[in-house]
Amino acid sequence: MTEAGSTDRLHHWLTGAAAVAKQAGQLILELYEEQAFETYHKDDESPVTSVDFAANRLIVDGLAALTPTIPILSEEGSHLAFAERQQWPRYWIVDPLDGTQEFIARSGDFGVIIALIENHQPVLGIIYWPPGDVLYTAQRGRGAFRTD
């Protein structure tokens, strides 16, 4: 694929993944405002909520529809061995609710993070902050942007 074709493909994926991040963020914000969630603890004793899992499902489904052949590595998903993951030429990394402790504490400091990795290098990045409806995006070769 030409460099221009690769850049256009990445931009298409960035646009789609940003829409998925915003959808997840809106779900997170609704449940935050309603205080409609349960809290659990992972094996490492860090907190996780039912909102983490709900946002994860939405994001994984959205990314799988956008890019069906690209694997997804999520903080709240299956934990595959590094030996397997290191062979992937391209994959998504997802933190469906970054700042779970802050979410629980109701500080408003939480967000959705999605990145696309190609050949062990980040090529796309998305951070969405639902309380302020602020979206940050970055694409290799095109720069980083904030959208309010």
PLM segments and residue spans:
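DPxDG-like acidic metal-binding loop motif
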Residues: 85-145
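N-terminal subdomain of lithium-sensitive/metallo-dependent phosphomonoesterases centered on the IMPase/IPPase/PAP
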Residues: 1-97
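Anionic-ligand binding region
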Residues: 148
